[in-house]
Regions:
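Acceptor/aglycone-binding surface of glycosyltransferases and processive sugar-polymer synthases
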Residues: 86-89, 93-101, 106, 118-191, ...
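Short hydrophobic beta-strand elements that form part
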Residues: 34-38, 62
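Acidic metal-phosphate-binding loop of nucleotide-sugar-dependent transferases
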Residues: 114-115
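Hydrophobic helical membrane-anchoring modules
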Residues: 2-28, 195-323
Length: 323
């Protein structure tokens, strides 16, 4: 009886300690975050985005312009927000400029075309203390079928190479911890910068995602589906070479199974139809299939090791954080 009572008291004491710790950890508020709008010729949407942000209670707004040739800058300045001209090319230059310029502990990036809902910002702030990056996973209602298909392929490819489980790596709305973001080394130039940031944050920090709304954009779309999709895939391959090279090269070598199997099927068809047995082609096909099988095994092992490494890193970081 005494033992049970002591055990119960111990549990209550632990619970009170947890409550006290939670009280001391101040939540992230609107004063702790700067909303960053990278823009290029967004005169049709930037004013609506700024109004939407302010309507939801956020006043720290930074517009980073990529040398617009329309009235984007004038429209943003007329709303009384800070407007900077980016250095460096593409969207990457805008993100780097923002990271160097903001003074708040967090920055939240969202496109200036009104596709993202400022009401969702609170979802990011609710988890900001525990993560270096939080990405917004878009609902698919206003995303075209072709874009959904491409995004699904890109996400699957990204997750396989990096060892993660994200549902939207191409999203244009995400929160960054400024102290962690300043350690990013960004090399991409276009829309693939989001995938590059997420890869580095996943490997070197902590990242998660929250569900967000996605609206029809205001103004003309700049995204050319196939061109930018290819750029993103190319960028992810480059990231794979850096963060998980064994899996990437093994996966590439495993593709040798396709011509190898084709050769063996052709040899079998020729033999069954009385055209003789093609020994040279059969040996070549067998070699390709064997090499591909071994590469697939090595790639699978590399992927398992990478995921184990990520789990260990996560446990270590959580231990350091709690200590």
């Amino acid at each position: 009886m005494l033992e049970s009572s002591l055990r119960l008291r111990g549990k209550n004491a632990s619970y009170r300690i947890i409550q006290e710790v939670e009280k001391r950890v101040e939540p992230v508020t609107e004063k702790d975050v700067t909303i960053v709008l990278p823009v290029l010729n967004e005169e049709d949407g930037v004013v609506a985005v700024i109004d939407d942000i302010r309507r939801n209670g956020y006043q720290n707004i930074l517009v980073v312009d990529g040398y617009s040739v329309d009235n984007t800058v004038a429209a943003a300045q007329a709303k009384g927000v800070v407007v900077l001209t980016q250095h460096g090319g593409g969207k990457t230059g805008a993100i780097i400029t923002a990271i160097e310029s903001v003074s708040t502990p967090y920055l939240l990036v969202m496109d200036g075309d009104y596709t993202y809902d400022a009401a969702d910002i609170q979802k990011f702030l609710a988890h900001a203390r525990n993560y270096d990056e939080i990405v917004g996973s878009r609902k698919s209602e206003n995303i075209s079928r072709l874009h959904r298909l491409g995004n699904g392929f890109i996400c699957a490819f990204f997750n396989a190479l990096i060892g993660t489980n994200f549902s939207d790596v191409c999203t244009g709305m995400y929160l960054l911890r400024r102290s962690a973001a300043r350690h990013l080394v960004l090399q991409s130039r276009g829309f693939s910068v989001e995938a590059e940031i997420l890869a580095q944050m996943s490997m070197l920090g902590r990242a998660t995602e929250v569900p967000i709304n996605y609206r029809t954009r205001i103004g003309k779309a700049k995204l050319v589906t196939w061109v930018h999709g290819f750029e993103i895939v190319k960028s992810i391959i480059a990231l794979g070479r850096l963060y998980n090279p064994i899996f990437l090269f093994s996966f590439t070598a495993a593709l040798a199974a396709i011509p190898g199997a084709a050769m063996l099927l052709w040899v079998l068809w020729m033999w069954l139809n009385g055209f003789g047995f093609r020994t040279g082609w059969a040996i070549t096909g067998e070699i390709l299939v064997i090499v591909a099988s071994q590469a697939f095994f090595v790639g699978t092992l590399a992927l398992l090791l990478k995921r184990s490494e990520l789990r260990i890193e996560k446990v270590v970081k959580e231990g350091i954080g709690s200590g």
